């Protein structure tokens, strides 16, 4: 690899090492060259030393740890105070979410959109979701469910819903065929 590619990377690491040494010595970091004079004062990210220590990597800075041992921060017995909210386990994994209820306005608008076109493009789904205050996923699932409902309603005439209705339909058809046969025989 040519030095053209390596030199910028090497200088970046030297600058980072110098900054780390300055922090370790308790010196403030120099302002970066891109710092704007008109920018507002920067806020501290961490309010306490304890919070700042949470983001440190003890396995990198302690060389005295035994090689076979697992670092302390990898143990599962860490206190909940050291876990960020997004790291905590969610509700019971087997529990389902509650049923989504839509307002009358949302349902009306979704129905109108469905009558116009039962399939949405991604762009239109985004527009509808923003207009109705729903997520894209909710709109997508509503349209999937509505298409299935439409399919069931339209297939009800073609295919009976249960075996009992099917038997009744066959009996009616046979009766109707017999009546047709009788009518044909009387006309001949």
From Swiss-Prot:
Ranges of compositional bias, category Basic and acidic residues: 152-176
GO biological process: regulation of transcription by RNA polymerase II
SUPFAM superfamilies: Homeodomain-like
Sequence segments annotated as region (Disordered): 152-188
Any GO MF annotation of the entry: DNA-binding transcription factor activity, RNA polymerase II-specific
Subcellular location: Nucleus
Top-rank taxon, per record: Eukaryota
DNA-binding region: 95-154
Motif Antp-type hexapeptide location, chain numbering: 83-88
InterPro entries: Antp_homeobox_TF, HD, HD_metazoa, Homeobox_Antennapedia_CS, Homeobox_CS, Homeodomain-like_sf, HTH_motif
Pfam families membership: Homeodomain (PF00046)
Keywords in alphabetical order: Developmental protein, DNA-binding, Homeobox, Nucleus, Transcription, Transcription regulation
GO cellular component, one term: nucleus
Major localization listed first in the record, in broad terms: nucleus
Keyword Nucleus among record annotations: yes
Its job: Sequence-specific transcription factor which is part of a developmental regulatory system that provides cells with specific positional identities on the anterior-posterior axis.
Family classification: Belongs to the Antp homeobox family.
Name this polypeptide is given: Homeobox protein Hox-D8
Taxonomic placement: Eukaryota, Metazoa, Chordata, Craniata, Vertebrata
Gene: HOXD8
């Amino acid at each position: 690899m040519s030095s053209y590619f390596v030199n910028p990377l090497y200088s970046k690491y030297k600058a980072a090492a110098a900054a780390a040494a300055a922090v370790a010595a308790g010196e403030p970091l120099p302002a970066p060259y891109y710092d704007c004079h008109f920018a507002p004062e920067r806020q501290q990210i961490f309010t306490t030393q304890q919070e700042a220590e949470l983001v440190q990597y003890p396995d990198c800075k302690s060389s005295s740890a035994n090689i076979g041992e697992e670092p302390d921060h990898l143990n599962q017995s860490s206190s909940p105070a050291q876990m960020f909210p997004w790291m905590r386990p969610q509700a019971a994994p087997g529990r389902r979410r509650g049923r989504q209820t839509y307002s009358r306005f949302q349902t009306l608008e979704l129905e109108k959109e469905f009558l116009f076109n039962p399939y949405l493009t991604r762009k239109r789904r985004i527009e509808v979701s923003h207009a109705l205050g729903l997520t894209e996923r909710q709109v997508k699932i509503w349209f999937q469910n509505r298409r299935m409902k439409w399919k069931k309603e339209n297939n009800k005439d073609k295919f009976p819903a249960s075996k009992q209705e099917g038997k009744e339909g066959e009996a009616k058809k046979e009766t109707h065929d017999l009546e047709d046969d009788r009518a044909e025989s009387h006309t001949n």
